[in-house]
Amino acid sequence: MAVPKRRTSKTRKNKRRTHFKISVPGMTECPNCGREYKLSHRVCKNCGSYNGEEVAAK
């Protein structure tokens, strides 16, 4: 069975983990009402529009 010869140092462990990070969500200003930021490809909570059309009644 494979066993590590030496203990992994904190520096080596942290260098390996540099890519494990949370990315910022893509927020855009609503083109219809312009008052609220919304996630991309989702309905605006303020005006209920998506892709220039009203899809959710307020």
Curated annotation (Swiss-Prot):
Q: Which GO terms describe its cellular component?
A: large ribosomal subunit
Q: Does the keyword Ribosomal protein apply?
A: yes
Species whose genome carries this gene: Staphylococcus aureus (strain NCTC 8325 / PS 47)
Give any single GO term for biological process: translation
Q: What is this protein called?
A: Large ribosomal subunit protein bL32
- Cite the NCBIfam families for this sequence: rpmF_bact
Citing just one GO molecular function, the answer is: structural constituent of ribosome
Entry-linked Pfam families: Ribosomal_L32p (PF01783)
Checking Gene3D superfamilies in the record gives:
Single helix bin
Superkingdom of the source?
Bacteria
Q: Does the keyword field hold Signal?
A: no
Return the similarity comment.
Belongs to the bacterial ribosomal protein bL32 family.
What the entry lists under InterPro entries is as follows:
Ribosomal_bL32, Ribosomal_bL32_bact, Ribosomal_zn-bd
Query: Which keywords annotate this record?
Result: Ribonucleoprotein, Ribosomal protein
Return the PANTHER family for the record.
Answer: 50S RIBOSOMAL PROTEIN L32, LARGE RIBOSOMAL SUBUNIT PROTEIN BL32
